[in-house]
């Protein structure tokens, strides 16, 4: 379980716009706060959509 999410890590869930999940695909807000973003990236919870595993994220580059 992700400490910031009510579902299993990597699973689907519904969460608010303040979602801070690290691996969860948030279907309700269509956001994905993924591991490709560096720890502490404030923009991740603001709409970062990761297309796949990467060292960089479009919102944090």
UniProtKB/Swiss-Prot annotation:
Protein family: Belongs to the metallothionein superfamily. Type 1 family.
Residues where a divalent metal cation 3 binds: 15, 19, 24, 29
Annotated positions binding a divalent metal cation 7: 50, 57, 59-60
Binding site for a divalent metal cation 2: 7, 13, 15, 26
Native organism taxonomy: Eukaryota, Metazoa, Chordata, Craniata, Vertebrata
GO cellular component terms given for this protein: cytoplasm; nucleus
Residues the entry annotates as binding a divalent metal cation 1: 5, 7, 21, 24
UniProt keyword terms in alphabetical order: Acetylation, Metal-binding, Metal-thiolate cluster, Zinc
UniProt: a divalent metal cation 6 binding residues: 37, 41, 44, 60
Residues recorded as bearing N-acetylmethionine in the entry: 1
Origin superkingdom: Eukaryota
Function: Metallothioneins have a high content of cysteine residues that bind various heavy metals; these proteins are transcriptionally regulated by both heavy metals and glucocorticoids.
Gene coding for it: MT1
Biological processes per GO annotation: cellular response to zinc ion; negative regulation of growth
PROSITE patterns in the record: METALLOTHIONEIN_VRT
Binding-site positions, a divalent metal cation 4: 33-34, 44, 48
The name this protein goes by in its record: Metallothionein-1
Beta, as annotated region: 1-29
């Amino acid at each position: 379980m992700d400490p910031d999410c009510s579902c299993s890590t990597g699973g689907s869930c519904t969460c608010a716009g303040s979602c801070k999940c690290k691996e969860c695909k948030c279907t309700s807000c269509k956001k994905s706060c993924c591991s490709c973003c560096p720890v502490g990236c404030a923009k991740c919870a603001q709409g970062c959509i990761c297309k796949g595993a990467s060292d960089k994220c479009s919102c944090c580059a």
